[in-house]
UniProtKB/Swiss-Prot annotation:
Database matches in CDD domains: Ribosomal_L16_L10e
TM region(s), chain numbering: none
Protein name, as recorded: Large ribosomal subunit protein uL16
BP-aspect Gene Ontology terms: translation
InterPro entries: Ribosomal_uL16, Ribosomal_uL16_CS_euk_arc, Ribosomal_uL16_dom, Ribosomal_uL16_euk_arch, Ribosomal_uL16_sf
Source taxon at top rank: Eukaryota
Keyword Ion transport: no
Keywords: Ribonucleoprotein, Ribosomal protein
Subunit structure: Component of the small ribosomal subunit. Mature ribosomes consist of a small (40S) and a large (60S) subunit. The 40S subunit contains about 33 different proteins and 1 molecule of RNA (18S). The 60S subunit contains about 49 different proteins and 3 molecules of RNA (25S, 5.8S and 5S).
Statement: the UniProt record of this protein carries the keyword Secreted: no
Family: Belongs to the universal ribosomal protein uL16 family.
One MF annotation (Gene Ontology) recorded for this entry: structural constituent of ribosome
Length: 220
């Protein structure tokens, strides 16, 4: 018996049902890799960022997430180069889908019990997605911006419902506005932290102030 189509589980009707000690025997999600490309490139390398945003409240299966990741990665690798981008899948499939198996062969009426004890067995997993939630994000250089948008347009066909491609106003995957980033960096208020960056402020205890630095680490 094949896998039940994901359209049967598209609407969010019930509460979150994650894998736990009460919900055992859950099959592994099809998507295992969430970061693709040059994921170790510093925050200054890729200033441009574009998002694929869900415009519906729905369940997205792990198979759809994997198909979209492959489609986006394949296009970017071919037209931009494997060293020219960083793709990140922003949703994780934690919600378990159940199926109440019915026998459809001859003589099945003596074996199955219909809707008696209809709480099903785990069949797969999906991600619960809200309106305005980011599904995929790509950061790259400005000269590959059109390739990133086309890659997300192709990945959009792997998802149900409506999605929008939105060019971010932020610098890469950070929360800092792109217009403000060069100025803050020249003032030494940006502390690179992998693919992200910390913004140093001047609030905090004087004991945390370091010599020769006007700003205090926001974490301190």
């Amino acid at each position: 018996m094949g896998r039940r189509p994901a359209r049967c589980y598209r609407q969010i009707k019930n509460k979150p049902y994650p894998k736990s000690r009460f919900c055992r025997g859950v099959p592994d999600p099809k998507i295992r890799i969430y970061d693709v490309g040059m994921k170790k490139k510093g925050v200054d390398e890729f200033p441009f960022c574009v998002h694929l945003v869900s415009w519906e409240k729905e369940n997205v299966s792990s198979e759809a997430l994997e198909a979209a990741r492959i489609a986006c990665n394949k296009y970017m690798t071919k037209f931009a180069g494997k060293d020219a981008f960083h793709l990140r899948v922003r949703v994780h499939p934690f919600h378990v889908l159940r199926i109440n198996k019915m026998l459809s062969c001859a003589g099945a009426d003596r074996l199955q019990t219909g809707m008696r004890g209809a709480f099903g067995k785990p069949q797969g997993v999906c991600a619960r997605v809200a309106i305005g939630q980011v599904l995929l994000s790509v950061r790259c250089k400005d000269n590959n911006s059109h390739n990133a948008q086309e890659a997300l347009r192709r990945a959009k066909f792997k998802f149900p419902g409506r999605q929008k491609i939105i060019v971010s106003r932020k610098w890469g995957f950070t929360k800092i506005n792109r217009a403000d980033y060069p100025r803050l960096k020249s003032e030494n208020r940006i502390l690179p932290d992998g693919v992200n960056a910390k913004l140093l402020g001047c609030h905090g205890r004087l004991a945390n102030r370091k010599p020769g630095r006007a700003f205090i680490d926001a974490v301190a």
